[in-house]
Design a protein with these regions (language model features):
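N-terminal, polar/charged subdomain of small-to-medium soluble alpha/beta proteins
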Residues: 2-96
Length: 96
């Protein structure tokens, strides 16, 4: 069951850089989690064209804290997934 969906749009000097949609499954999307995702993914904005959509799913399954990031681009889909026992660790690892 999807509990919360947040949409965050980055704007730098009036230009739309990336749109991040964060979905939580079996987890409450706290402001701290949203901020951690924003901070990590904002470092990637220099690699993508303006108006790039980024889809993030945070989920909890028993002891598994999982983050999935999907970035559709022209002709490709970039995807990263990390699992650990701590969601903040998973968020840190997904950027790499």
């Amino acid at each position: 069951m999807i509990q919360d969906i947040s949409r965050i749009k980055y704007t730098v000097k009036g230009l739309d850089i990336m749109r991040i949609t964060i979905t939580g499954r079996n987890i409450d999307l706290t402001q701290g989690l949203k901020d951690a995702v924003e901070e990590k993914l904002s470092k990637l904005e220099k690699y993508f064209k303006p108006d790039t959509d980024v889809y993030v799913t945070l989920s909890v399954e028993k002891e598994r804290q999982k983050i999935e990031v999907t970035i559709p681009t022209k002709g490709h889909v970039i995807r990263s997934e990390q699992v650990s026992s701590d969601m903040y660790v998973s968020i840190d690892l997904v950027e790499e």
